[in-house]
Amino acid sequence: MIVSGELPAGERLVEIPTAERLGVSRMPVRMAFRTLEQEGLLSKNEGRGYTVRTVTGEEIAGAVEVRGVLEGLAARQAAERGLDPTTQEALQQCLATGDVLFAKGYVTEEDMEVYHDFNRRFHQVIIEASGNPAISHALARNDHLPFASVSSLAVDRNDMAREYRRFNFAHMQHHAIVDALVNRQGARAEALMREHANATMRYADLFGSPHIDHEGLKVIRDM
């Protein structure tokens, strides 16, 4: 609701009215407020309640750049260690799913739900393959802004042709990354992964624009 613009920046939120608005008890609302505060989407008021924060395109871009560095490091370390058969199979499954998705030459909103799932899995497999838990911890600290992590995906429903080109290109990058990993080309894998993060910079453009069309924006997040 915050990212979609239904709850605009500056709006004050209090537990009871919000719970009544959503038709739920106070406890899940209280927990959601705390989580959103940690993610940087809400700021706690001195008295009661919270206020919806303004998230700038510059903040998103900065967090995405940091993610690229961390995931690039994960890719390099995974390539240098070598991939075990289970990891290779998991990555190949992600590639195969994406190949089928983009083969028809267009994408639907439902397709983007599928993309969100296998893309998140793709990134997680590489992070785990690095064998470096510090990377996961650092990413968790960085993922406090919307779209700083791969757990969130924004789709511009007003221009699905453009979104097809953008995500199809990102999937082609998936193929190149896997090729570098399999061939144990650490420097190449790192460079490709960092460049891959730049595909998310479109979010900084979307949310940094004063003319953002919230109605045309579909946000897909982990449940």
Model-derived features with residue positions:
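Short, flexible turn/loop "capping" segments at secondary-structure junctions
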Residues: K44-N45, N119, F169-H171
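Conserved amphipathic alpha-helical segments that form helical-bundle/coiled-coil interaction surfaces
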Residues: P85-D156, Q173-A176, A180, R188-T200
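Short linear motifs at protein or domain termini
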Residues: M1-T86, A134, L206-M223
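Membrane-interacting alpha-helical segments
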Residues: E15, Q92-L95, D99, S151-D159, ...
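A ubiquitous short alpha-helical element
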Residues: G57-A61, A79-P85, Y106-E110, R157-R166
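C-terminal regulatory/effector modules of DNA-binding transcriptional regulators
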Residues: R21, M160-M223
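Amphipathic alpha-helical repeat elements characteristic of tetratricopeptide repeat
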Residues: G68, Q92, N168-M172
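Short amphipathic alpha-helical segments at helix-loop
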Residues: G10, R48, V52-V55, Y106-V107, ...
